[in-house]
C-alpha cells in the first residue's frame, strides 16, 4: 500500500467463502481404492471320494481373510480457487523462508556473530507470523495472475482475492475482532492506467478490466498484525512490457541497496539508486517515445504491528533524507513508474479509510458516527479498510457518519492517487525484514 509523500499523509500514523473445497487425495473420486477385496473361497476336491466314498464328503479349505488396508491420503494441496488454510498445508507451523541475503561490508559480522544469532532465534514467532502471511500472499497472487482476464469486473477480481486471503489465513472477519487476528492487511487495490494507487471498487461499481489496461494489484495479508505488503502490475499487451520491467528492476534495485548496506543505510541513498534505474528505461507507445519517470511523491514505508504506515518513508527519488534503517524494522520497498508527469494527485471516488492511531478525543454529536466508530474499533482497529468491508458486516446508511469521522480527524480517508489522464503507471513492491543476522525479502516468490 503506497505511502504518499505529502504533508497531509506524512503526519499519519496508520497503523464468504464461496464453495469451500478441501484438498483431496491424489486421485479424487476413488474412495477405498486401496481396499483389498476378500479372496474367493478355494474349494479343494475330496481326496478320497473316488476310492472309498467316505461319508464325511469333501474336505474344504478354510477361508483366508486378509485384513482390509486403506490407501493413505496424499499430501494436502491448495485448491482452485484457494480455500485451504496454509496452516493445514504446513501442519508443523514452520513456513518457507523468504529470500535470505547476508549483510555485507561493515555489517558482515552480523551473519556469524553469536549475540546476533541468539537475537535471531528469539524472533522465531515473529518471523513465522510474517512467513505465514507471505505464503498466503504468494498462493493467492499465483492464482490471481493465472486467472485475471480482461472482461472481468474489478469487483469480481477484488472480492476473489480478498475471499482467498481470508480463507488461507483462516479468518473470515465476520465476527468482532476476527479480522484483527488475521486476514486482509488492507483492501485489495486495483488501480488502472493513470491511477497509481488506493483504488478499489465501492459497492455498485461496474468497471470492467479491458485488454489495453495496465492494472496495479496491491494487497496485504496479515497474521496477528504482521502485515505482508506486496504488489505487482498486470498488462495484456506486450507494448507495456518496458514499463513493467523498469519498475520491477527499480524495486529490485532498492532491495539491492539494502543488500549492500541494510541496517544503517540512509533513505536518500536508496531513493537515488531507484531513480537512476527507473530513468534508464523508456517506452514507445503509438509511435511516441516516453521516458519512464519515478512518481516522486509516492514512497515505500516501514510497517509496524497492525500499522501499515509506521512513520518512516523510503523515497524513490534522490533527496536529502538522512533517516537510517534500523535492526528489527520491517519495510515495504515499493516503486512506481509513469509515462506521465511522475507526480500524482488525489482524484476519483474514495474507497480506502483507516482509523488514525492516537487520534485526539473529539466529541461526536451524530449517533451514526458513534455507532460506526464502535464497529471500526472492534473489527479493524488501526488496519485500513474500505466501504465494501462495512457492507460485508451489514452496515448501511453509514456515509453521513463516516464523513463526520473523517472531518473530525478520527478516520483518515485515502483517495485514489492519479497521474495525468492518458498516462500509464506501474508498481512492484516487496516486504523486507531486517533481521539481526541477515535480511529477508519475506514476500519474494518465483513470480517477482
UniProtKB/Swiss-Prot annotation:
<dbReference type="InterPro" id="IPR002468">
    <property type="entry name" value="Pept_M24A_MAP2"/>
</dbReference>
<dbReference type="InterPro" id="IPR036388">
    <property type="entry name" value="WH-like_DNA-bd_sf"/>
</dbReference>
<comment type="similarity">
    <text>Belongs to the peptidase M24A family. Methionine aminopeptidase eukaryotic type 2 subfamily.</text>
</comment>
<keyword id="KW-0479">Metal-binding</keyword>
<dbReference type="Pfam" id="PF00557">
    <property type="entry name" value="Peptidase_M24"/>
</dbReference>
<dbReference type="GO" id="GO:0070006">
    <property type="term" value="F:metalloaminopeptidase activity"/>
</dbReference>
<protein>
    <recommendedName>
        <fullName>Methionine aminopeptidase 2-1</fullName>
        <ecNumber>3.4.11.18</ecNumber>
    </recommendedName>
</protein>
<keyword id="KW-0378">Hydrolase</keyword>
<feature type="binding site">
    <location>
        <position position="309"/>
    </location>
    <ligand>
        <name>substrate</name>
    </ligand>
</feature>
<feature type="binding site">
    <location>
        <position position="198"/>
    </location>
    <ligand>
        <name>substrate</name>
    </ligand>
</feature>
<feature type="compositionally biased region" description="Low complexity">
    <location>
        <begin position="75"/>
        <end position="88"/>
    </location>
</feature>
<dbReference type="GO" id="GO:0046872">
    <property type="term" value="F:metal ion binding"/>
</dbReference>
<dbReference type="GO" id="GO:0006508">
    <property type="term" value="P:proteolysis"/>
</dbReference>
<dbReference type="InterPro" id="IPR018349">
    <property type="entry name" value="Pept_M24A_MAP2_BS"/>
</dbReference>
<dbReference type="GO" id="GO:0004239">
    <property type="term" value="F:initiator methionyl aminopeptidase activity"/>
</dbReference>
<keyword id="KW-0031">Aminopeptidase</keyword>
<dbReference type="InterPro" id="IPR050247">
    <property type="entry name" value="Met_Aminopeptidase_Type2"/>
</dbReference>
<feature type="binding site">
    <location>
        <position position="301"/>
    </location>
    <ligand>
        <name>a divalent metal cation 2</name>
    </ligand>
</feature>
<dbReference type="InterPro" id="IPR036005">
    <property type="entry name" value="Creatinase/aminopeptidase-like"/>
</dbReference>
<feature type="binding site">
    <location>
        <position position="229"/>
    </location>
    <ligand>
        <name>a divalent metal cation 1</name>
    </ligand>
</feature>
<feature type="binding site">
    <location>
        <position position="429"/>
    </location>
    <ligand>
        <name>a divalent metal cation 2</name>
    </ligand>
</feature>
<feature type="compositionally biased region" description="Acidic residues">
    <location>
        <begin position="34"/>
        <end position="46"/>
    </location>
</feature>
<keyword id="KW-0963">Cytoplasm</keyword>
<feature type="region of interest" description="Disordered">
    <location>
        <begin position="1"/>
        <end position="90"/>
    </location>
</feature>
<keyword id="KW-0645">Protease</keyword>
<feature type="compositionally biased region" description="Basic residues">
    <location>
        <begin position="59"/>
        <end position="74"/>
    </location>
</feature>
<feature type="compositionally biased region" description="Low complexity">
    <location>
        <begin position="47"/>
        <end position="58"/>
    </location>
</feature>
<feature type="compositionally biased region" description="Low complexity">
    <location>
        <begin position="22"/>
        <end position="33"/>
    </location>
</feature>
<dbReference type="GO" id="GO:0004177">
    <property type="term" value="F:aminopeptidase activity"/>
</dbReference>
<feature type="binding site">
    <location>
        <position position="218"/>
    </location>
    <ligand>
        <name>a divalent metal cation 1</name>
    </ligand>
</feature>
<dbReference type="GO" id="GO:0005737">
    <property type="term" value="C:cytoplasm"/>
</dbReference>
<dbReference type="GO" id="GO:0008235">
    <property type="term" value="F:metalloexopeptidase activity"/>
</dbReference>
<feature type="binding site">
    <location>
        <position position="229"/>
    </location>
    <ligand>
        <name>a divalent metal cation 2</name>
    </ligand>
</feature>
<dbReference type="InterPro" id="IPR000994">
    <property type="entry name" value="Pept_M24"/>
</dbReference>
<comment type="function">
    <text>Cotranslationally removes the N-terminal methionine from nascent proteins. The N-terminal methionine is often cleaved when the second residue in the primary sequence is small and uncharged (Met-Ala-, Cys, Gly, Pro, Ser, Thr, or Val).</text>
</comment>
<feature type="binding site">
    <location>
        <position position="334"/>
    </location>
    <ligand>
        <name>a divalent metal cation 2</name>
    </ligand>
</feature>
<dbReference type="InterPro" id="IPR001714">
    <property type="entry name" value="Pept_M24_MAP"/>
</dbReference>
<feature type="binding site">
    <location>
        <position position="429"/>
    </location>
    <ligand>
        <name>a divalent metal cation 1</name>
    </ligand>
</feature>
<dbReference type="InterPro" id="IPR036390">
    <property type="entry name" value="WH_DNA-bd_sf"/>
</dbReference>
